[in-house]
From Swiss-Prot:
Known function: Component of the eukaryotic translation initiation factor 3 (eIF-3) complex, which is involved in protein synthesis of a specialized repertoire of mRNAs and, together with other initiation factors, stimulates binding of mRNA and methionyl-tRNAi to the 40S ribosome. The eIF-3 complex specifically targets and initiates translation of a subset of mRNAs involved in cell proliferation.
Keywords of the record: Cytoplasm, Initiation factor, Protein biosynthesis
Organism: Nematostella vectensis
Protein family according to the UniProt entry: Belongs to the eIF-3 subunit E family.
Protein name, UniProt field: Eukaryotic translation initiation factor 3 subunit E
GO biological process: formation of cytoplasmic translation initiation complex; translational initiation
CC per GO annotation: eukaryotic 43S preinitiation complex; eukaryotic 48S preinitiation complex; eukaryotic translation initiation factor 3 complex; eukaryotic translation initiation factor 3 complex, eIF3e; nucleus
Cited CDD domains: eIF3E
Subcellular localization: Cytoplasm
Single Gene Ontology MF annotation: translation initiation factor activity
Keyword ATP-binding: no
PANTHER family linked: EUKARYOTIC TRANSLATION INITIATION FACTOR 3 SUBUNIT E
Domain PCI: 225-396
């Protein structure tokens, strides 16, 4: 279902290596023509050192042709440079096998002090640090993400504060951990990178905006795979003004992921009101079945529309790389939202009518409601004789009302800040693309 596919938008804010898993997913789902996807992969690979992979893709594209000489020659060059860099960095890498030095790495965070120790005891020269960074990035470009992560860790341990490559090294380390699916370590690197970005007082407004936008997109890999991720994405995006502003200004399509996280997170039900306000405000710039489902249900109280959007949501979820694993949780919670909202309005409703709204048989609907009541997920009771469900009435606590009013003030402040940001953007004529050594890639063949 290419209509709602976001890969082309996401790719603009991802390192090219992070785009590969998305393309593999699209290939399995058969959303696009396979030939076009293979051409896209080959284009992606053109600026990497994964020559063997590029050869395989080329053979898939052109099975009757010989592999181009340029690829064969590039492979020879890559192997030679890899050996050269390995030889140049061997002395500094071997230092991390020294127990005394390893103990110092664990006990101090002063890279300059550690490097002075290496200069005194192992005759390591300052220029070797740049070579170590180059070797780490070369390993990454070859697709050796475990090697890249290890050498970037070494580099960051030794790099002095303010080193020009430190920020790039953090991006590279995060990308490597994501591609190895080390979600706990990736979350640590994500938080570390966020702290560095937010503490950079010398960065301009536009640079910070772009870096936050990149961080939001990269974080999706972590948030939709880590056990705590669906809580963390809500805290990052909905309740940190600078990140909400980044979404409103640069990437409103991220609302799909925020909305899914809220719907599938039973403990965060109170944030629905704030989320719906954001969705309403941004509906003129972005909407899809997932955001429209909440609009139908909580803004328009259009239950037929919500039911229709829920069916569309299932297709969107199954064809979204980040959300496919959320499908069952989403459908279950979305049905509960429809049920609660409908019963809250009507107080008493026939099970047969409810079954129709939930796209179930009356027997399935009754069993579903009984299970909700039994598991204490719902304050309601069933009148078996009349075939009715009667909802209980719960008044919100004073404490909860105070919290919601406070959040409303915070939200209004965020909206005001976002409007100012947009006005500044229009006055400046838009944003220039920003890219570091870990560059984004725009897969144009997926543009709708």
């Amino acid at each position: 279902m290419a209509e709602h596919d976001l890969t082309s938008k996401m790719g603009c804010f991802l390192d090219r290596h992070l785009v590969f898993p998305l393309l593999e997913f699209l290939s399995v789902k058969e959303i696009y023509d396979e030939h076009e996807l293979l051409k896209g992969k080959l284009d992606l690979l053109s600026n990497t050192n994964m020559v063997d992979f590029a050869m395989d893709v080329y053979k898939g594209l052109y099975p009757d042709e010989e592999v181009p000489t340029s690829l064969v020659e590039k492979r020879v060059e890559v192997v030679k440079e890899l050996k050269d860099l390995q030889a140049q960095t061997e002395p500094i890498i071997n230092c991390f096998s020294d127990p005394e030095f390893t103990a110092q790495v664990q006990s101090t965070r002063d890279g300059r002090q550690l490097f002075e120790y290496l200069e005194r005891n192992h005759d390591i020269k300052p220029e070797m640090l740049d070579v170590l960074y180059k070797f780490a990035k070369f390993q990454y470009e070859c697709g050796n993400y475990s090697g890249a992560a290890e050498y970037l860790y070494f580099y960051r341990a030794l790099a002095p504060g303010g080193d020009t490559n430190s920020l790039n090294a953090l991006w590279g380390k995060l990308a490597s951990e994501i591609l190895m699916q080390n979600w706990d370590t990736a979350l640590e690197d994500l938080n570390r990178l966020k702290d560095v970005i937010e503490s950079n007082t010398s960065a301009g407004t536009l640079q910070l905006l772009q870096e936050r936008t990149w961080l939001i997109h990269w974080s999706l890999f972590v948030f939709f795979n880590h056990p705590k991720g669906r809580d963390l994405i809500i805290d990052l995006i909905l309740y940190q003004p600078q990140y909400l502003n980044a979404i409103q200004t640069m990437c409103p399509h991220i609302l799909r992921y925020l909305t899914t996280a809220v719907i599938t997170n039973k403990r965060r039900r109170p944030v629905l009101k704030d989320l719906v306000k954001v969705i309403q405000q941004e509906s003129y710039t972005y909407r899809d079945p997932i955001t429209e489902f909440l609009e139908c249900l909580y803004v328009n109280f259009d239950f037929d529309g919500a039911q229709k959007k829920l069916r569309e949501c299932e297709t969107v979820l199954l064809n979204d790389f980040f959300l496919v694993a959320c499908r069952d949780d989403f459908i279950e919670n979305a049905r509960l939202f429809i049920f609660e909202t409908f019963c809250r309005i009507h107080q008493c409703i026939s099970i047969s009518m409810l079954a129709e709204k939930l796209n179930m048989t009356p027997e399935e609907a009754e069993r579903w409601i009984v299970n909700l009541i039994r598991n204490a997920k719902l304050d309601a009771k069933i009148d078996s004789k009349l075939g009715h469900v009667v909802m209980g009435v719960q008044a919100p606590s004073v404490y909860q009302q105070v919290i919601e009013k406070t959040k409303n003030l915070q939200y209004k402040t965020q909206v005001l800040a976002g409007n100012i940001e947009k006005k500044l953007t229009q006055d400046k004529g838009g944003y220039d693309a920003y890219g570091g050594s870990w560059n984004a890639y725009e897969p144009g063949f997926l543009a709708h």
